[in-house]
Amino acid sequence: MDDVSKCPFSGGVKGFKNKDWWPNQLDLSVLHQHSNLSDPLGEAFDYAKEFKSLDLDALVKDLHALMTDSQEWWPADFGHYGPLFIRMAWHAAGTYRIGDGRGGAGTGQQRFAPLNSWPDNANLDKARRLLWPIKQKYGQKISWADLFVLTGNVALESMGFKTFGFGGGRADTWEPEQDIYWGPEGKWLADERYSGDRELAGSLAAVQMGLIYVNPEGPNGNPDPLAAARDIRETFARMAMNDEETVALIAGGHTFGKTHGAGDASLVGAEPEGADIAQQGLGWASKYGSGKGGDAITSGLEVIWTTTPTKWSNNFFWNLFGYEWELTKSPAGAHQWKPKHGAGANTVPDAHDPSKRHAPSMLTTDLALRFDPAYEKISRRFLENPDQFADAFARAWFKLTHRDMGPKVRYLGPLVPKEDLVWQDPVPALDHPVVDDKDVATLKSKILASGLSVGQLISTAWASASTFRGSDKRGGANGARIRLAPQKDWAVNNPAELAKVLSTLEGIQKEFNASATGGKKISIADLIVLAGNAGVEAAAKKAGVDVAVPFAPGRTDASQEQTDVESFAVLEPTHDGFRNYLSGKQWLSGEELLVDKAQLLTLTAPEMTVLVGGLRVLGANANGSKHGVFTAQTETLSNDFFVNLLDMGVAWTPVDKGEHTFEGRDRKSGAVKWTATRADLIFGSHSQLRALAEVYASSDAKQKFVKDFVAAWTKVMNLDRFDLKA
């Protein structure tokens, strides 16, 4: 067939998909990403094992050699690729945001769209191609994700800077992540994400579509350093950085290298995803001069900050405060700054022509570090105390590149720092024998005889474990931070009732630990999970099913000193469809928020379905809500939720203007039988979810429902047990 566009089996066909016909259809595909079907390494591949066999010293030596091995097809600025690789590592990690924990360097996503083609990542495709011979040499012993970060570290070391350390363990994924919301804009560098007085929407952190952080020319290209400071503070805070870390990162990064804006940006070609097939995954081919070296165009800015752009120094601050600055434009027409009255002439080297010299230059965002009062105070301290600056940058760089890796137990390799850092959410090491099966049975009996209800046991365990985020591996039951600020006071946890449950469980814990032999102890973290398990078993027994919920002791209890209250505050749920909880104004529908929560819990659609159905009848709703409790026998692990949801004898109507809550009335009598939210009714409305609900509503589903619920429950309880997965 000559015309492949007419072939229904060809990749060229442009037929409408379901999402084109029904744009508001709930998308479940985010629950089924990164399956073995897309992974060429197979299910048995163990990256941690491969990494441990890596000759790390040899790899680092090869990376050092690469730094000054300039290639004709993309020459190194100042004869050193270090600054390019720092930018590569920074931009791999810098997509992280604290709001939902998504983004970051953890899976090597810079290889894929959209990140590989973001305007802010222009010409980083060249950095990755420069790395390919080394990646090829070491194969699967080092992931792209780890290699990006390690290369950034080696780049810094090769230019005289002492880094804080490096932890490996980032396993690659093999397709773009679909769960990350990058913004509402349909055009590069647009900023529809703002409302009101420059209020940034949702969990977004970057100021414009396709930028990692902020616009270096100032907000929307307005060269106002103070306005830029406001954007910087908001954006860096949403990426987990305080003012000191922000100043250190900007100044430290801009101690090296240059920006590129040699000529007319309209002469630059398409990004990698839009480039011709003959470009083989490269983009931004430029028709300006040679298109490379001294003719390179990346951001459109042409800035060299320091006199020694391939050597660590304090020169960024010397220049920032040593000159008065005036606005100018780059050869590409972008706003930047130069010293007034021709000062600083010939103090800065040219990147490619040793016969040329320049004056230093600065970005609008650099000047924010001088003219914003809080930033200026920090900057002057760093100017006067270079050792403090170096330490702050080393720590901030380590945090930047490791923030999305979760607890320290996940770090691999000999370069992991010994120091525990509070942002790593540390928990104490296990220092005692754990309970055995006989102890577990005894404890469960005491829990069930304590007067606590099944609903209280299950709600508390869920509240503890379901804080976990698969995005940045934070939260979870280990540490029992549900008993500490801020979690103990979260509205979703019903603080008054939670305090009673914890007090009872702590009494059982103290009694057991005081009487146990052989030094055995049980942590409150373990006991909370065990109590939830006991509740599930009791509820299953009431439904006529005997089941043993798996339990793996070994959790420990964190202290308040090990818990950064401000850092943990971002984990507070504003929604949890599993508990039928929704607070405040949301930017997604109830069913979309449920799927978002399920994705963060690494659940599949069947796991999400069985958990919602089970938790509803077990009485786990937040604050005793009756929405979705489609049963006359609560605290019984039955399939009643699904049976009654699919009952054609009930008709549903919304009870509020926004259609968030609904009444289910008997079709004959008109009497209200049930109430529900969108997070309930979606299991009868959405065709895929209804198909799953039908499985569990069937007359032969009794055993399967309990078995599947227990499996999904256990998965959630153990999401942060990286020690079990090692």
Curated annotation (Swiss-Prot):
EC number(s) on file: 1.11.1.21
UniProt region (Disordered), positions on chain: 334-359
MF (Gene Ontology): catalase activity; heme binding; metal ion binding
Residues that hold heme b according to the record: 254
InterPro entries (UniProt xref): Catalase_peroxidase, Haem_peroxidase, Haem_peroxidase_sf, Peroxidases_AS, Peroxidases_heam-ligand_BS
Keyword Isomerase: no
Role summary: Bifunctional enzyme with both catalase and broad-spectrum peroxidase activity.
Family classification: Belongs to the peroxidase family. Peroxidase/catalase subfamily.
Protein name: Catalase-peroxidase
Gene: katG
